[in-house]
Regions:
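Structural preference for solvent-exposed beta-strand-turn elements
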Residues: 1-215
Length: 215
């Protein structure tokens, strides 16, 4: 496995991936990020078993491959690198060799096979709205989720699509918040509850741009 990318792109990608790395866990493997070199991009995957993140950055891939490494450690190393290209290599013993300018690091990697990868998503069933709209819908409703862990379903928000209507709702048995928008197309009825913690992290990742879409 071998690739080259800019320090800025690597730093941005790993910082997004860190949002799904648990602060404390009895499963050390969840403290890691899967780094996979594919064609002209690098895919980074993290999963704390409640929130999973998969993000991609552009790169020049000389040799495809996949490796697992402690996420916070690699993030801290990349953060301190000079603003130059990062050269990332993995040898046959899963050792990571990272070069950037005059800096050189030898980092222990891990076989990725035991990492809980994210499930495959049926991309045929999707809607697309602006990141600004979704960010605002979350902001306008998330304050009324419950913090009572004994009633888990109230600690999340209901996402419901019915025809051409998209609705987000939350309640804590005192307050109720509902936000609706009209979609450009009609879809089958579907609803799901998403944890408030997950939505907070998603909201931080969204740029909030009107031209940027999220699906």
């Amino acid at each position: 496995m071998k690739f080259t990318c800019t320090k800025n792109n690597f730093n941005n990608g790993i910082n997004i991936a860190l949002k799904a790395v648990p602060g404390k866990t009895t499963m050390p493997i969840l403290e890691c990020v899967v780094i996979e070199a594919q064609e002209e991009s690098i895919k980074m995957t993290t999963n704390d078993m409640q929130l999973g993140i998969e993000t991609r950055i552009p790169a020049e891939v000389q040799e495809e491959g996949i490796i697992l490494v402690n996420a916070k450690m690699i993030a801290e190393i990349v953060r301190r690198l000079p603003d130059e290209d990062v050269n990332f290599e993995v040898d046959e013993n899963n050792n990571i060799l990272l070069f950037c300018g005059k800096s050189k690091f030898n980092i222990p990697g891990i076989n990725h096979e035991e990492f809980p990868m994210l499930p495959q998503i049926d991309i045929e069933k999707k809607i697309a709205i602006s990141q600004f709209t979704l960010k605002e819908m979350i902001r306008q409703t998330i304050f009324s989720i419950s913090d009572n862990e004994s009633n888990k379903i109230l600690t999340g928000e209901l996402f419901e699509i019915n025809g051409d209507e998209f609705k987000i709702a939350s309640l804590d048995l005192v307050r109720v918040s509902i936000r609706k928008i009209q979609l450009k197309e009609s879809y089958d009825h579907i609803k799901v509850v998403i944890p408030g913690k997950t939505l907070n992290e998603i909201s931080k990742i969204l740029t909030g741009g009107m031209e940027d879409e999220v699906t």
